[in-house]
From Swiss-Prot:
Exhibits Kunitz trypsin protease inhibitor activity. GO terms for molecular function: serine-type endopeptidase inhibitor activity. This is Kunitz trypsin inhibitor 6. The lineage of its organism: Eukaryota, Viridiplantae, Streptophyta, Embryophyta, Tracheophyta. The keyword DNA-binding does not apply. Belongs to the protease inhibitor I3 (leguminous Kunitz-type inhibitor) family. It comes from Arabidopsis thaliana. Disulfide bonds join C70-C115. The keyword Transferase does not apply.
Amino acid sequence: MKTFQLMMISFLFVAITTTSGVVSEGNDVVYDGEGDPVKPNVPYYISFMTSDYNMWICRMQYGSTDPNSCPQQPLMVTHPNLAAPTPVMFVLANKSDVVRESAKLKIKFVGPRQCGKSGFWKVVQRNSSEGEVFLNGSKSMSHNDSTFAIHKTNEYYKFTFGDGDYPTTISMTNDYPIYRLLSKRLSGEMEIYFYKNLTTSEG
C-alpha cells in the first residue's frame, strides 16, 4: 500500500511539474511596443529602450551620412533622419506563428540586397571574446555566425548571439551618436523594443 501511495505521489509530482513547464513556455512570447505578440516574417523597427530615446537601428555605413554608401551594417543611430531607420524581420527555425524568448532566429533587414550583401545579420569574430555585427549572413540555421535569440531584461529585451551553452550578449560601442553593435561576453546589454511602424512609436 505504501509503495502504491508513493508511486501515486511521484506521478502527481511529475504531472504538476510538466503542466507548469507548459504554462511557463506559453508565457515567454516576445511583445512589441503596442503590447502585441511579435510575429516572424513581419517588419519591425528596433529602438533603444523605448521610442522616447529616438535611437533606432539603421542599415548604414559607419561614419557616413549617405544612405546609399557601402559597405553597410546594422548601427544604432541617435536622432536619425526619419527615412533612415530600417525595419527587420525575424526568421525562425521552427514553424511557430509568434516569436518566443530564447528561440533560435535569424535577423534580416527588410528590402532588396544592397551593396551586394544579403540583409541577414552576421557576427564576425575579432578575437575569442569579441565580435561585431555586420551583414551578409546566411538564412540557413546551420550557420552559427548568423544565429540569434531574444531574451527579456527587466523592462525591455536584448539580443544574444550563438546557439551554444554560453551565448554572448549584443551590446553597443561608445561611439555617440552612432553606435556599432558588438557581441561580447560579460558586457553591458543593448536593451531594445520593437515597433511595427514609426508613426505609432512617435505618437
